[in-house]
Amino acid sequence: MKICIQGLGFVGSAMGVAASLSKNKVVGIEQPTQEGKKIIESINKGIFPFKTNDKALKKNLKILSKKNLLKASHLNSHYEDADVIIVSINCDLKRKNNEQKINLDSFKKAIKQFAVKIKEETLVIIESTVPPGTCKEIIYPLIYNSFIKRKLDPKKFYLAHSYERVMPGKFYLSSITNNWRVYSGINNVSAKKCRNFFKNSTDDFNW
């Protein structure tokens, strides 16, 4: 199974390690910015790109990198043969008149990057914290319309949401692999596939 992690921030990078522990091939995708290139280079060297005192996280990343089970890239072409895509990117917050409002423009742009690439039967899991209705009103239509334009069956992609649950610290990796997950799907099939993914394709998830 090939898994793509979109967004290699503090959570996405750790999720990449967690997902590859069960010998899945994982590719983390990050933007080719100056910071993004540093993250990509670090992961491909087997070094966690952020400060952490979790020895298990650092050790496993080094091992997985050497085994070519986990790598990082800026190429969107990796989405083309992915079986699962995990979205782990931030939504922009903008302050106006002393109020914070969420701007989803960059988030939608990120979704479009893989929506035009993925194949039928791909499972998309949103780990990002998003406003209620985002999956149904924004993400699902973007992928659906892309499938129509590409003459693919719009019923043959699966969308689920399972928000990130992490506890940074010396047991950071364990907090990902040994924590209860809450999940929901755009339909029953998507929900079932999401559950099966976390249950069978990652290391020691609880349900």
PLM region spans:
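Gly/Ala-rich phosphate-binding loop of Rossmann-like dinucleotide-binding domains
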Residues: 16, 20-21
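Conserved N-terminal Rossmann-fold NAD(P) cofactor-binding segment
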Residues: 25, 31-84, 88-101, 143-151
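Residues at the starts of beta-strands that form the adenosine-phosphate
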Residues: 2, 25-26
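Hydrophobic/small residue at the entry helix of a nucleotide-binding pocket
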Residues: 11
